[in-house]
Structures are given as C-alpha cells and as structure tokens.
C-alpha cells in the first residue's frame, strides 16, 4: 500500500492510530489520554500538509474505546471480545504508539508491539524513563530492551524528567512534573505529524516459512539462571520426543544484543509453535512481545504459567495475566511436565 493510500485511509477514519494503554494502572490511562491529545494534533497537522481533512476516528484508545463499543456483551464473553476488538484495530491501524517505562515493560503493551510488527503495522516506542539500559559483557547502552527495539519502527525517549534537579518545595515539584507531561504531549504531536508526512515501516519480516514440527522456546532470552535451567530441561525433553527445538539466547554468548535479538525473532518465525514463559510478577516484556510477534505471523503459541495469583474484577475479568497474553495463546499449561504432551497435541 502506498504512503498516500495509507494516509487517505487514516483521514477517512478507516485506520486510526492505536494508542496503547496500561490496563491496570489509572496513571497509565491518564498518560494514554494525554498522549492521544498530542497524537490527534499531530495527525491533523500532517493530513493538512497533504491536503487531506481528517475524519474521526483518527485514534483508538483501548479501555475507553473498547469498553464503549462492547456495551451489552455478555459478561463471560466480555474480555474475549475486548481482545478481538483491540487486535482488529492493531491490524488495520495506521501505526501503534506504545508508551513504555520502568524496568518491567507492560506485558500487554509489549504484546501489542510484537503483534503490530507481525501483521505489518509500524510500532513506535515512547519511552518515559530518565535512564537508559546497559548490559554486562557487551557494555552496550540501549534505550529499550533489545528485542523490543528490533520490533519497533522507531523509538523515542520522552523521559526528560531529570532527577539531578533541585526542587523548590511541593509547588515547584508539581509544576515541573506537569511541564514534563506537557513536553511529552508536544513531542508526540510532532512525531505523529512526521509519521503522516514521512511514513515509517515495520522491520522486514523474515522470508522463511515455519518448519513443520519445529518448536521455539522463549523463556526470557537466558537473562536469568532459572530461565536457562528451565529452557535446557524442556529442550532436552522435547528433543527426546522427536521435535526440532530452538531457544532464545539473546543474553547468552557474544555479539551485539540487537543482532542476537534478531536471531531470536528469526528462530521464532521459523518455528511452527512457540512456547513462552509467563512466570513472574508480570510476563517479561520481551517475552510478551515475542509472543505477540509469533501470533501476528500466525504461529501457534503455548503459554507456560505456573503462578497461583488471579487478577479478579468479577466474572468479566478473572485471569492470571493480561488478556492479550492469555487469549493469544492456543493453550496454557501450569506445569513443566505438561509442556511436551501439550506440544504433541497442538502439532498433531
């Protein structure tokens, strides 16, 4: 599709920009709404520069727009309907804006970044950290975790809040926090104007078909010893069962992390089924992104989640993890010894 055709679909309200939003945190919803304001200004300015007049909706804001569209859906089907609606908007969106921050990237947003890359929608990472990441062994300095960086069409750091500043009391501190949000909103406006005038493109997809019976293990890329131990055990068990197995190892071995992250994505794309590890306070952001990428490419997904905690709001939301992770998986297992039988069942 040509850039002008894409811009015309945006202007007609057929391809709104998906502004990803943290689901559980009210501050995340506030931030998403603020960034959407900047996004709208920028989109309208960009369309005007092309001689086009934008017609609503130019943006899609999850939680607000999903819930509003699904009034009357039966309780037991509500969260599944949200997943389907959000996924549809990512697939046809002009772009995806992903506000991320903190040391644990939000798993739902990370999944959406990966899914966008898999279906060909450019994802823009908006980081709100005052810090960057450095990695032992390579001494690389990265704005975002390597796998997320590889999936994005563009990364921007909006985290201009400087911890070294001295503040003159409560009012000065509050004023500076508000000013930082104003600056972030303005930066998003300029970025979205540029997206319309000079479209970005998702990373090129691997030109490889999945090998029948091949399984890829995404247990965090080997950053922690427990991940490496569990992945090694499952690899041995799956190979004894006759499956060809690859393992994400971006944090092991030598070479630039971004290159190793690309190798993990290529290995997942070359597999018929991807097994992801969901254990932890939240699903690791890179693992969630790889799961989204695999699902976007049409690969099967097996989610391993041994946790006992449930996230409960009532019958409409009673889950162990973000609904994007749960509903995108073909099957979820609770114990390591269930993985091999589940792989057999999924791959026939």
Where are these regions (language model features)?
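Conserved catalytic or regulatory cores that recognize and/or transform ribose-phosphate-containing ligands
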Residues: 1-348
